[in-house]
Amino acid sequence: AAANSAPTAFDFTNQSDVPLTSSRTSANTVTIAGLSTGTSLSVSVSGGTYSKNGGSYSSANTTTVNGDTFKLGHTSSGSFSTSTTTTLTVGTGTGSFVTTTVAQDTSPNEFTLQNITNAGLSTVYQSVATQVTEITGTVTVSVSGDGSPQVKIGNGAWTSGPTTITNNDYINA
């Protein structure tokens, strides 16, 4: 019989909602099968590393025969909602492991800036600083309303234009 150029189809289980910049390994192990007796195929990996037969992770080219097992690994993206793919090529066959990072949470826990009653005309007032929580990464903040409102994040400068805030920062208006 002629030698095979690819094993039986294989693939790795994808992972979603993974943390940013985290070391990830495929949950499943694939076993090479379907090769003719005595057939050995070349193996390469792109976008990450592989572990062959439970060994150390490597990116070096190797060979495989029926019964060899593989897992894949890589570091997830440092950006929100972004996929990272590692592909194992065995002969002319391929299988991929994809991780997708968590989405950015831009909706903070509810917070209230106090109202001022009986405010004097042409008088500038400042709210009590309120902590913004339950957001991830850097989030844009804007302010609007009557009387040329401004916003200040932490010890930063007052601004009427958009600015940014991160989790646990304090906001004044």
Q: Can you name each region flagged by the protein language model?
A:
Residues 81-92:
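A short beta-strand micro-motif common to beta-rich folds, especially ectodomain repeats
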Residues 6-42, 109-142:
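Solvent-exposed, low-complexity, repeat-rich "mucin-like" stalks and linkers
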Residues 69-81, 170-173:
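Extracellular/luminal low-complexity segments enriched in Ser/Thr/Pro
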Residues 39-41, 46-48, 84, 137-141, ...:
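Short beta-strand/loop motifs in extracellular/secreted proteins, especially
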Residues 45-56, 145-157:
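Short, solvent-exposed loop/linker segments at beta-strand-coil boundaries, enriched for Pro/Gly
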Residues 93-102:
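Edge beta-strands of extracellular beta-sandwich domains
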Residues 2-5, 101-108:
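Extracellular interdomain linker/stem segments of modular secreted and single-pass surface proteins
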Residues 61-68, 163-167:
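Short proline/glycine- and polar residue-rich coil/turn motifs
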